[in-house]
């Protein structure tokens, strides 16, 4: 059995296969997931697991150099945005790098998900709780 935080085999395999500049999306329960992209559905019930819990576990396993967030989160879900940006600052400190944060429209965000290696669906039921993580290299 693995000793690290992430126990989900499908998600663990996916993170291990993500190469430099490739992306992984973590989303709320409502984001449409294109049929052409692998779906890793973790949602059990409303709020379980949460977006922030899932982000924390994934970023403990994945080196991140860039993120994309929907602009609409600023107005519609500022609490999640604040917590997300705080987690990213902590991740920068842990990784020793600066993470580029880019805001785009929700429509553009959905188009970007088409290029993700996989989309991880959480049980989060708050608006615009979505992020695209782009892999960096730890060397």
Swiss-Prot record:
Enzyme Commission no: 5.4.99.62
Gene3D superfamilies: RbsD-like domain
Cellular component terms (Gene Ontology): cytosol
GO biological process terms on file: D-ribose catabolic process
Location, primary (coarse class): cytoplasm
Subunit structure of this chain's protein: Homodecamer.
Matching HAMAP family: D_rib_pyranase
Name of the protein in its database record: D-ribose pyranase
